[in-house]
């Protein structure tokens, strides 16, 4: 079938639309008509080369929601017309990690950077002029239609707005989970969030949900600091030095109980700054993505050992998508999670590049692509 998609032809590159050939749902797959897609910073990393993909061209987008139009062979529990939110990480429910409640580390995610079907690096669902096109994390939500593995799909109620739910499969789950699942926050704690874009703003929400008494949002962009207050931050500052000093004033000089690093392009320097901001036995959660080839992280081994500080990586906020996405939908419908307020601009498919320009200009918390009904 034919579909319009936003692709990156090579790196560094800029998103452009093209007519693509898309496979219909095969065994274990769903074909979905897209309703909305979030503009996640990770898709920009693939365009800039900060995160080089396995194949180019690649059709971007991994955070989205839509309506099932075709159900492949051997797929149980799904029907045409079902509403779906994609998890950018698959969950097979069978591997060691899924069995231990760590679906975000599912073994089927090992091939995500190939752009191919999950279990066959030579098999692609999209083509341009007869040549294979990679799917971003096997999903490609920057397309009018997409075909995905059922392990990337989570069914949601048909009466919940997909425009808002589209953000759950990456940005919201990642930020929220970084606070709720990994930061070890107790009621009354002091928490710093470094960078309050589409992920960090949800770490703010998660810290508030966990009972943090002081939530310090750090961002150089005034617009984002203002938005952070709307999402529950108690204090906002421009840089981590100010944030760390403020945390010490709240804790009799001890430092933050947890610092969550959600900077758009995270560097080892950001992690070192966060490490210096926490108290004894405090936690740094590293969620942001940067140059994955860098290995020059500088930390005090003495502080790590003697002060029992903890450095915690975060993939999708340690979320279990089959359980956590429905939970987040429920929180949203009960007014306990802000989603509508995250959306700062709406774009059409041919405006994806503009959306990322706006993101870099500090105009967006989360932009979304909205498709025709």
Where are each of the predicted segments found?
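Glycine-rich beta-strand-centered segment in the early N-terminal region that forms part
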Residues: 23-37, 50-99, 104, 112, ...
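Cysteine-cluster motifs in flexible loop/terminal segments that predominantly coordinate metals
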Residues: 88-151
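Short SAM/SAH-binding signature in class I
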Residues: 254-260
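Mid-domain Rossmann-like dinucleotide-binding core that forms the NAD(H)/NADP(H) cofactor-binding site
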Residues: 144-145, 151-153, 157-245
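C-terminal hydrophobic helical "lid"/dimerization subdomain
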Residues: 1, 241-242, 272-276, 318-373
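Glycine-rich phosphate-binding loop and adjacent beta-alpha segment
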Residues: 264-336, 371-373
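Short amphipathic alpha-helix with an adjacent loop that forms part of the alpha/beta core around
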Residues: 243-253
């Amino acid at each position: 079938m034919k579909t319009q998609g936003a692709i990156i032809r090579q790196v560094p590159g800029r998103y452009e639309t093209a007519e693509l050939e898309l496979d219909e749902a095969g065994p274990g797959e769903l074909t979905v008509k897209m309703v909305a897609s979030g503009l996640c910073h990770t898709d920009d990393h693939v365009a800039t080369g900060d995160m080089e993909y396995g194949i180019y061209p690649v059709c971007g987008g991994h955070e989205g929601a839509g309506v099932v139009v075709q159900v492949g062979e051997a797929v149980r529990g799904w029907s045409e017309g079902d509403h779906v939110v994609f998890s950018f990480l698959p969950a097979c429910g069978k591997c060691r990690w899924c069995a231990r409640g760590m679906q975000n580390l599912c073994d089927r995610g090992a091939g995500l950077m190939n752009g191919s079907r999950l279990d066959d690096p030579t098999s692609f669902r999209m083509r341009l002029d007869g040549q294979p096109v990679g799917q971003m994390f096997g999903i490609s939500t920057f397309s009018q239609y997409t075909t995905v593995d059922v392990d990337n799909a989570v069914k949601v109620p048909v009466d919940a707005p997909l425009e808002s739910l589209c953000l759950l499969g990456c940005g919201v789950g990642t930020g929220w989970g970084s606070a709720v699942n990994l930061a070890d926050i107790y009621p009354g704690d002091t928490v710093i969030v470094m960078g309050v874009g589409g992920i960090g703003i949800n770490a703010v929400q998660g810290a508030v949900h966990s009972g943090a008494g002081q939530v310090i949002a750090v961002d150089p962009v005034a617009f984002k600091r203002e938005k952070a207050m709307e999402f529950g931050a108690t204090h906002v500052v421009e840089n981590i030095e100010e944030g760390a000093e403020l945390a010490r004033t709240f804790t009799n000089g001890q430092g933050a109980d947890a610092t969550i690093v959600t900077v758009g392009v995270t560097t080892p320097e950001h992690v070192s700054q966060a490490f210096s901001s926490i108290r004894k036995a405090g936690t740094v959660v590293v969620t942001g993505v940067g140059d994955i080839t860098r290995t020059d992280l500088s930390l005090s081994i003495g502080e790590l050992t003697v002060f029992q500080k903890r450095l915690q990586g975060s993939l999708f906020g340690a979320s279990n998508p089959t359980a956590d996405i429905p939970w987040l939908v429920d929180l949203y419908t009960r007014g306990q999670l802000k989603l509508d307020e995250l959306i700062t601009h709406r774009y059409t498919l041919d405006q994806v590049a503009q959306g990322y320009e706006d993101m870099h200009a500090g105009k967006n918390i989360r932009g979304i692509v909205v498709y025709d009904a």
